Regions:
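Divalent metal-dependent phosphate-bond-processing catalytic cores, especially two-metal-ion Mg2+/Mn2+ enzymes
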Residues: 1-18, 33-63, 76, 120-209
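Boundary/linker segments of alpha-helical solenoid repeat arrays
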Residues: 108-109, 167
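His-Asp-centered metal-binding catalytic motifs of divalent-metal-dependent phosphohydrolases/nucleases
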Residues: 47, 65-99, 110-119
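Alpha-helix N-cap/N′ positions at the starts of helices
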Residues: 26, 90-91, 135
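A short small-residue
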Residues: 25-34
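Acidic-glycine-rich active-site phosphate/pyrophosphate-binding loop
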Residues: 17-25, 70
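A structural motif
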Residues: 107-108, 148
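Post-HExxH zinc-binding segment in Zn-dependent metallohydrolases
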Residues: 102-106
């Protein structure tokens, strides 16, 4: 399986310098504007929670991470999911275009565009690229089953049961799983502790919801 973007040059991964960074209230206003279903909102909150926790830890470890930008991109990563469920199309591509239109912030949109799969090699030995918006959002999304934080294995075993009806589908799911494990190992190596079974204090978020 070859991702259609894989033949293109890798993008620059920089902290946002132009456009706005919407806070939670502004992100939720966009959820309303684009008619996001309640279950996708709950999923997005958990993805944003995990991405934010990871971004804060990376920043505390000395990496130059814009935590607010990571959170906003994670909150908006599935902004077009409801539309795509109803009408088809790539929710990542459409969502990225909406985020550019609404915020003029291409770094946030990059996280939305690439949250399903990073089509190039994961920069395991380049922490300045690894600790960027797309990888926080990709990994956080892979750790959430519906609206619960779970280990990668639990998430992907569920996906294989629900969607692995063909060999092509199973191959795609396994490739995504492998990429999640690669990002996880790289995060662990640079942060200096294990995150593969970390709940990121997600119970606190569930209690507040």
């Amino acid at each position: 399986l070859v991702h259609p973007l894989a033949c293109l040059p890798e993008p620059a991964l920089e902290s946002p310098t132009q456009g706005s960074i919407p806070d939670d209230a502004a992100c939720m206003a966009l959820w309303d504007k684009y008619g996001m279903l309640d279950n996708i909102r709950a999923h997005s909150r958990m993805v944003a929670h995990i991405a934010t926790e990871l971004a804060q830890r990376a920043r505390a470890a000395g990496f130059p991470v814009n935590v607010a930008a990571v959170r906003a991109s994670a909150m908006l990563h599935d902004i077009a999911k409801t539309y795509s469920v109803l009408h088809g199309g790539s929710h990542a591509q459409l969502g990225a275009s909406w985020v550019v239109a609404e915020t003029r912030n291409h770094a946030l949109a990059q996280g939305v565009l690439l949250h399903v799969h990073w089509p190039w090699a994961v920069p395991e030995q380049e922490p300045e690229r690894l600790f960027s918006i797309p990888f926080f959002v990709i990994y956080a999304d892979k750790r959430v089953k519906h609206d619960q934080c779970v280990p990668l294995r639990q998430r992907y075993e569920d996906l294989l049961v629900r969607y692995g009806h063909t060999e092509k589908a199973r191959k795609g799911i396994r490739l995504s799983w492998q990429q999640g494990e690669c990002i996880e190992r790289a995060f662990e190596a640079h942060l200096g502790y294990a995150i593969h079974e970390d709940s990121f204090d997600s119970g606190r978020l569930v209690q507040r919801a």
